[in-house]
């Protein structure tokens, strides 16, 4: 039987790049590089080898792989096969990860070899924990077929290996051109509620977002994108730009040196990622690299105080773009960061709506959005509403800019991570001796981020070491949701439904200067 590979809308930019510039270096990392042609050929080989091993369009793949060009090869291979692809962060905590895997029920997984090594040798994992070496608190499920990715680390069990899937295959294949959108990419929202919220996107919705971002960046052939984010890697490929994969474990000096050495001139990140660089520049009386052409900010609120500090250490020629969107609809509005830093409004300037996006404000001032970018549905639901309710409150000003007024539902955005208190409070209350728990966030102007507080009501006054329990073990939670400050109090409640009074907790924190 001849395998059919899908020439979908996300595949076409890579195929066009290969025809135009087959030998262009499209990805560089510390010790390796790959051309557009080799990337495409490797992806086709992986797809064909998977097909020979029984993969069909009904299969579901979960990826637990670090961002790398190998990740992108895998991603393109799975697009070619029209399977469902789920990207799940392995550092989200044991219970959270297990709940998502249970809901997803993957038939295949691509897993980093280091995670497999620790999973196969539990005593080494326990040793790492005793030595306080940070490692993901997850267990690889039994059931899915596993492909080992990354470094050549020995494992007890025998797995498929990515290097073997890249080997040449003699099998002939046919191309198919999909006329309809293919629902194939699942992204789990960070810090979701008790029911895991897998957001299912189509290739059309993702391609539409990438096309819009490509126009916003307006890159030139020799521009170099610095990122560790998969969607910006895909954007680089679609734009024909070289992507240098940014190491994630660098201090501010190392990152500035890396930006200089690699001549990065396009960069994306949340404010929390930029803040250490700003502080380093301020302390050393230096600026960001002069060749920095475009800085894109998103994934978290971008406040004026932060922007003014950023502008003070940026070259005057560097363009700043602030993006507003969400997992369900990745790009809604954009604002020029230099304009936003000075803009006077009754709220937070989100900017003009991007092309093709429809917005309406309901009677409760909630922002509703729809366009070709919109997700297909939540994985656990059969369909979605026509308009996506963002949970944000907003309005338009006289300049037709979208202005953010606040949040409709309880959620704390810390760095680039959404924290829903109810999700974590349930886990914390399982700790013996903890009667009640309540999380609140208070924005700190100096750190340009939310300070996360956890109020504990104890039935056992000797309960202690909550931070350690939340960092590892049976009660571990997302590392981004581990509180900065933990304190004890009688949790206040209000109303007929006896809900936690979070405003009273915030007032208590401020009054007691916690």
Each predicted region: which residue ranges?
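Conserved AMP-binding A3 loop
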Residues: 35-37, 175-177, 184-208, 242
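Conserved AMP-binding/adenylate-forming
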Residues: 49-92, 223-224, 418
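AMP-binding/adenylate-forming catalytic core of the ANL superfamily
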Residues: 267, 274, 371, 393-479
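Conserved AMP-binding/adenylation subdomain of ANL enzymes
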Residues: 206-224, 228-266
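Conserved ATP/PPi-binding loop(s) of AMP-dependent carboxylate-activating enzymes
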Residues: 349-356, 360-387, 401, 417-419
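Conserved C-terminal "lid"/linker of ANL adenylate-forming enzymes
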Residues: 412, 439-443, 453-455, 472-514
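Conserved pre-ATP/AMP-binding loop-to-beta segment of ANL
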Residues: 7, 22-23, 140-141, 147-154, ...
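Gly/Ser/Thr-rich phosphate-binding loop
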Residues: 152, 160, 266-268, 280-344
């Amino acid at each position: 039987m001849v395998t059919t590979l899908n020439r979908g809308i996300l595949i076409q930019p890579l195929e066009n790049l290969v025809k135009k510039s087959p030998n262009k270096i499209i990805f560089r990392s510390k010790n390796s590089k790959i051309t557009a042609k080799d990337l495409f050929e490797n992806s086709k080989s992986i797809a064909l080898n998977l097909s020979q091993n029984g993969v069909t369009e009904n299969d579901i793949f979960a990826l637990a792989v670090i961002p790398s060009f190998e990740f992108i090869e895998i991603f393109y291979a799975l697009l070619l096969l029209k399977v469902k692809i789920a990207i799940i962060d392995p550092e989200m905590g044991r219970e959270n990860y297990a709940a998502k895997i249970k809901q997803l029920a993957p038939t295949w997984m691509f897993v980093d070899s280091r995670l497999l090594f620790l999973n196969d040798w539990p005593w080494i994992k326990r040793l790492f924990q005793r030595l306080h070496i940070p490692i993901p608190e997850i267990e690889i499920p039994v059931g899915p077929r596993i492909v080992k990715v990354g470094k050549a680390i020995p494992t007890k069990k025998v797995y498929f290996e990515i290097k073997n899937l890249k080997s040449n295959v003699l099998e002939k294949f046919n191309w198919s051109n999909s006329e309809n959108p293919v629902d194939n990419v699942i992204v789990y929202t960070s810090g979701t509620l008790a029911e895991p919220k897998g957001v299912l996107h189509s290739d059309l919705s993702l391609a539409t977002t990438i096309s819009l971002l490509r126009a916003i960046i307006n890159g030139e052939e020799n521009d170099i994108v610095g990122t560790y984010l998969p969607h910006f890697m895909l954007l680089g490929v679609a734009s024909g730009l070289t992507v240098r994969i940014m190491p994630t474990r660098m201090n501010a000096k190392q990152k500035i040196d890396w930006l200089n050495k690699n001549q990065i001139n396009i960069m994306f990140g949340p404010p929390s990622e930029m803040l250490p660089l700003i502080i380093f520049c301020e302390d050393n009386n230096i600026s960001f690299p002069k060749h920095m052409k475009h800085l894109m900010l998103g994934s978290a609120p971008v406040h004026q105080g932060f922007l003014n500090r950023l502008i003070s250490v940026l070259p005057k020629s560097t363009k700043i773009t602030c993006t507003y969107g969400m997992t369900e609809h990745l790009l809604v509005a954009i604002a020029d960061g230099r304009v936003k830093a000075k803009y006077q409004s009754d709220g937070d300037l989100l900017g003009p709506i991007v092309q093709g996006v429809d917005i309406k404000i309901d009677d409760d001032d909630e922002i509703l959005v729809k366009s070709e970018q919109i997700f297909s549905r939540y994985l656990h639901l059969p369909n979605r509403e026509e308009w996506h309710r963002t949970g944000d409150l907003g309005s338009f000003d006289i300049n037709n800019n979208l202005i953010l007024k606040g949040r409709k539902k309880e959620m704390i955005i810390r760095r680039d991570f959404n924290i829903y208190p109810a999700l974590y409070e349930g886990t914390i209350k399982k700790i013996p001796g903890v009667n009640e728990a309540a999380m609140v966030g208070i924005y700190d102007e100096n750190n340009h981020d939310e300070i996360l507080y956890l109020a504990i009501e104890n039935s056992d006054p000797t309960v202690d070491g909550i931070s350690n329990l939340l960092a590892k073990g049976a009660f571990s939670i997302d590392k981004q949701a581990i509180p900065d400050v933990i304190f004890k109090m009688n949790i206040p409640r209000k109303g007929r439904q006896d809900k936690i009074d979070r405003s009273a907790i915030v007032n208590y924190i401020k009054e007691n200067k916690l």
